[in-house]
C-alpha cells in the first residue's frame, strides 16, 4: 500500500475512512471532534478542518447525535479530508442522502480524485453514483464476486439484445450472459462481438447489467 509492504502506521495516516456516518461519538460537537482527531492523526490539519466545517455549514454547538443523516456524512467527510489522505474508503457514503446533498458529495469526491495521487474505494448500492465516480467496478452478490472490470470496458463489451423468444434460441449460447423472457418478448445481456450483425442492440447501463446478472436466467 502506497509503495510499502503491509499497512504501516504511516500508511494508515494516509487513509480517510467514512463508514456510513458511523464512528463519531454522538455527544461531541464539531469543534470537539476536531480536538479528538488532532490527537489521533499525526498530519491533522486544524485549518483545513475548520474550512471543511465552514463549507459544510456544520454548527459549532450542535452535537453529532442531533445531526441529520446528511450532516453526519458531511461531518465524517470533514474528518476524513482534514488529514490530507491519499486514499478514501467509503462505505455506503451516499445512502440515505437527499438528491441535492448526494450531488454535492459526488462533486466533492470527483474533485478529490482529480489529483493523480488520490484514489477512492467505495461500496454502494446506488449504482448510478458508482457510474459517475468509478473507473473500475466490482460486483458482489451473496458473497460472490461476479465481475471486476474497467467501467468503459463493461459498456463496450456488453449490450442489451432485444427480440422474440424464438430469435433468442437462435443466438450463440456463448454470446449470452443472462436472459429474460416475458409475455412481451425477450431480452438478453450479450457480448457484443459474438452476436450477428444487424441484431437489435442497445447500450447497457451498469445498473441494468447488474440487474440482468442477478435476475435474468444465467445460461452458463
Which role does the model predict for each range below?
Residues 88-92, 167-171, 194-198:
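Short, surface-exposed beta-strand/loop "edge" segments at domain boundaries and coil↔beta transitions
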Residues 105-190:
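ABC transporter nucleotide-binding domain
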Residues 178-220:
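C-terminal coupling/interaction segments
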